UniProtKB/Swiss-Prot annotation:
Coiled coil: none annotated. One of its GO terms (cellular component) is host cell membrane. Belongs to the orthopoxvirus OPG112 family. Its main location: host cell. The keyword Transmembrane helix applies. The chain crosses the membrane at residues 10-32. It is found in: Host membrane; Host cytoplasm. This is Late protein OPG112. InterPro entries: Poxvirus_H7 (IPR006872). The gene is OPG112. Induction: Expressed in the late phase of the viral replicative cycle. Pfam families: Pox_H7.
Amino acid sequence: MEMDKRMKSLAMTAFFGELNTLDIMALIMSIFKRHPNNTIFSVDKDGQFMIDFEYDNYKASQYLDLTLTPISGDECKTHASSIAEQLACVDIIKEDISEYIKTTPRLKRFIKKYRNRSDTRISRDTEKLKIALAKGIDYEYIKDAC
């Protein structure tokens, strides 16, 4: 399965800055009924721990345009509490994805927009995103415009 363009467009426009890789995993499970093939312990450019989820030929972080660096086994000790916390969240999400979505307002809004927003409108938002990024315009401005 390829990365979904509608989902990427919504994540980068209307929901920019609101989602993380756990949210993306939950959305993929809910919308596409797919579980990740692999879990990757990573850090972002600021050194903050984050779990990334690998699917057939893409990662959850790609929906958010995040550049994550996998951590080594030795580095896992440094991030042990964050790893435990996020793995517990993953278990909660996987246990009952429907309930998790119902109790998370931003994910409910995302799914509603994903299902109800027309392809034309999402394509228009994607085009605005491409133009803005080519001109170096900030994501926050793009989010407000979509």
